[in-house]
Amino acid sequence: MIGDGKLLTNAHCVEHDTQVKVKKRGDDTKYVAKVLARGVECDIALLSVESKDFWEGAEPLRFGRLPRLQDAVTVVGYPLGGDTISVTKGVVSRIEVTSYAHGSSELLGIQIDAAINPGNSGGPAFNDDGDCIGVAFQVYRSDDAENIGYVIPTTVVSHFLEDYERNGKYCGFPCLGVLLQKLENPALRACLKVPSNEGVLVRKVEPTSDVSNVLKEGDVIVSFDGVRVGSEGTVPFRSSERIAFRYLISQKFSGDSVELGIIRGGEFMKVQAVLKPRVHLVPYHIEGGQPSYLIVAGLVFTPLSEPLIEEEEDSIGLKLLTKARYSLAKFEGQQIVVLSQVLANEVNIGYEDMSNDQVLKLNGTRIKNIHHLAHLVDSCKGKYLVFEFEDNFLVVLEREAALDASSSILKDYGIPAERSSDLMGAYVDSIEHSEATNQQNFGDSPVSNLEFGSEGLLWA
């Protein structure tokens, strides 16, 4: 409880929600709660409860400071093993930029040795003064480790809340949109004409980021808003600690302007850039909970997403999986559209065994996203619908026959509509860089496009 009729929990606790109910300890009444905002990257959700009875006698929690190592911590929740409240105690083991499993992102996290189990998610963690130092959210499980739990610190929680208050919605944590390499090797620094033991090398710039206008591959970032960046990709943190460079970025908000000190060709210069959330070509979560889909003569098209990959991992080809892992969006709104399955009918004879194949073009026009595909189908006046797939496979349907068969196919398979509700409206092409859509290749990256990259390489 944080006051003003609002509650906090983990985003994964209310994922795909249709109705959320909450109740207080010692109360036998459940109250309906409304999800106001859901932060996938930070795994936080903001809820509101309108009933005055729920808030009677309730006191909001006080947010405490970021703890120190070995500070005592108490975790409260309702984990597996019983129905009543559970309290476990431990100490703070580590504070660093941590991988958030739910959003595949990296933000500041607190590692503790107090027991955290399924059901603890969304519960508060307290210090000895009774102040809330964060929200329990995940645990590390391994045969070689035990008692490694994680808490979202109040600094991340406060950023989420301020983002919501500023914009009336949650916009997300921003990024620079670059792939960086550490500069710990002296020969590498000398080759790049970096005079001191500092800086990180720009290896890739995301086409959708604002810094694509000011940074180039081969630039070396040596400062961020005046803070020096070390050659191992860290910056000063508190009095005598260092932390990953991306921590500074996570303290900013979408739309904030920053000053970068860079070395280019041996010369130092300063550039300005605007931060904004990362554009994911393949989203980790489906916004709204329901996937977009379009059915054309039994051919079911949908955007590629991580949930789809997890569901169909055995049937998704290596080429498509590689593209999902290593490609970057070249413009906002870009999607990888796949034919997920075929609802067998005489109109699509010969295509029944197709599944999880990427569709590239319709009647010669490259497909930008699922809504664009729906628009191309609707606006087609020719005799045929010609779909071009990856690996040069061709699917041709007679347009009139396809339209005539649609209603019977939907009826046979018990499907209420040929497309999802988000595709019902008119298509608006808002893509600014139209030349990017004509290119055949996506922005391939030398490393996985997951936030945490690989050893020596990091996304920021």
Stretches with model-predicted labels:
Residues 2-85, 118, 268-270:
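Conserved active-site neighborhood of the chymotrypsin/trypsin-like protease fold
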Residues 6-11, 66-79, 91, 112-116, ...:
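Active-site-proximal beta-strands of protease catalytic cores
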Residues 166-227, 302-352:
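PDZ/PDZ-like groove recognition
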